[in-house]
Swiss-Prot record:
GO molecular function, one term: metal ion binding
Name of the protein: Light-independent protochlorophyllide reductase iron-sulfur ATP-binding protein
Reactions it catalyzes: chlorophyllide a + oxidized 2[4Fe-4S]-[ferredoxin] + 2 ADP + 2 phosphate = protochlorophyllide a + reduced 2[4Fe-4S]-[ferredoxin] + 2 ATP + 2 H2O
Gene: chlL
Pathway(s): Porphyrin-containing compound metabolism; chlorophyll biosynthesis (light-independent)
PANTHER family hit by this protein: LIGHT-INDEPENDENT PROTOCHLOROPHYLLIDE REDUCTASE IRON-SULFUR ATP-BINDING PROTEIN (PTHR42864:SF2)
Native species: Prochlorococcus marinus (strain NATL2A)
Co-factor binding comment: Binds 1 [4Fe-4S] cluster per dimer.
Residues the entry annotates as binding [4Fe-4S] cluster: C124, C158
Region (Disordered): 1-20
Oxidoreductase among keywords: yes
Cross-referenced NCBIfam families: DPOR_bchL (TIGR01281)
Keywords, ordered alphabetically: 4Fe-4S, ATP-binding, Chlorophyll biosynthesis, Iron, Iron-sulfur, Magnesium, Metal-binding, Nucleotide-binding, Oxidoreductase, Photosynthesis
Family: Belongs to the NifH/BchL/ChlL family.
Origin organism lineage: Bacteria, Bacillati, Cyanobacteriota, Cyanophyceae, Synechococcales
Protein residues bound to Mg(2+): S43
Length: 296
């Protein structure tokens, strides 16, 4: 039976499904949740960041939290079955599953899981994410993991898709140098602050993606207390790597911009390993963003 908790227990104005303590990822692993506006490039960013961590010698697990289940295909070079699909095949008797049924090895040893989701208009994606973590723990698949990356659906900040924040140490927000992306980022900051009242998650910073300039992002950062951790310009090799179903680390290093992008991902991964300082950011009111951004 599902139970709810009071608003004050889970952040101001928030009523969430209470998480089973047994589903928590144990201390020791660095857990990162990647959020951002829908279509901003979170899956590409997450997969390349996972690859970068693996290049630095870390054991990495990436969990895709989108019903589209396309988070990890540049790591595995294919679309893999989702946890929810596999569970349905065994009538949700998880004891009948083997790890290889739902976890797949990708580029440079990165382990990949796609949680999937319920059919459109039904169920809760957050529940699916919770069941995925529970399944991984039941099979002792998190015990030797150094880094866990949650790639989260769009800019939805409801109780369901805020579920990864209950596991994460840090949240990274992917944005572009435009109003819509920054507006979505502001909402995500508010959601993280609500969760941070009772969970360990903290803001890690901003990843600027597909952006030649940073002026609007930096203007927002200055007002809110955020910080840009990495900057990826609109390099065509990134787009083509996704079409080739591979990470940026598998692209020809002679191609324009490839080495620069690889180094930026490696730098970001190293910053996260070095225990990045949590940020204390305050979101703006909607009207304040309208007044702040853009040109007169």
């Amino acid at each position: 039976m599902t139970s709810t908790i009071t608003r004050k227990e889970d952040g101001e104005g928030s009523v969430q499904v209470k998480q089973d303590p047994k589903a928590q990822i144990q201390e020791g692993a660095l857990v990162i949740a990647v959020y951002g506006k829908g279509g901003i490039g979170k899956s590409t960013t997450s997969s390349n960041l996972s690859a970068a961590f693996s290049k630095l010698g870390k054991k990495v697990l990436q969990i895709g939290c989108d019903p589209k289940h396309d988070s990890t295909f540049t790591l595995t070079h294919k679309m893999v079955p989702t946890v929810i699909d596999i569970l349905e095949e065994v009538d949700f008797h998880s004891e009948e599953l083997r790890p290889e049924d739902f976890m797949f090895k990708g580029f440079n040893g990165v382990m990949c899981v796609e949680s999937g989701g319920p059919p459109a208009g039904t169920g809760c994606g957050g529940y699916v994410t919770g069941q995925t973590v529970k399944l991984l723990k039941e099979h002792h698949l998190l015990e030797d993991t150094d880094v866990v990356i949650f790639d989260v659906l769009g800019d939805v900040v409801c109780g369901g898709f805020a579920a990864p924040l209950q596991h994460a140490n840090y949240c990274l927000i992917v944005t572009a140098n435009d109003f819509d992306s920054i507006f979505a980022m502001n909402r995500i900051v508010a959601a993280i602050n609500a969760k941070a009242k009772n969970y360990k998650v903290r803001l890690g910073g901003v990843i600027a993606n597909r952006s030649a300039e940073l002026d609007q992002i930096e203007k927002f950062n200055e007002r809110t207390g955020l910080k840009t951790m990495a900057h990826f310009r609109n390099v065509d090799a990134i787009r083509r790597s996704r079409l080739k179903k591979c990470t940026i680390f598998e692209m020809d290093s002679e191609e324009e911009g490839v080495v620069e992008v690889q180094n930026e991902y490696l730098s970001l991964a190293q910053k996260m390993i070095d225990n990045v300082e949590p940020l204390e950011a305050e979101p703006l009111k909607d009207r304040e963003i309208f007044d702040l951004l853009g040109f007169d």
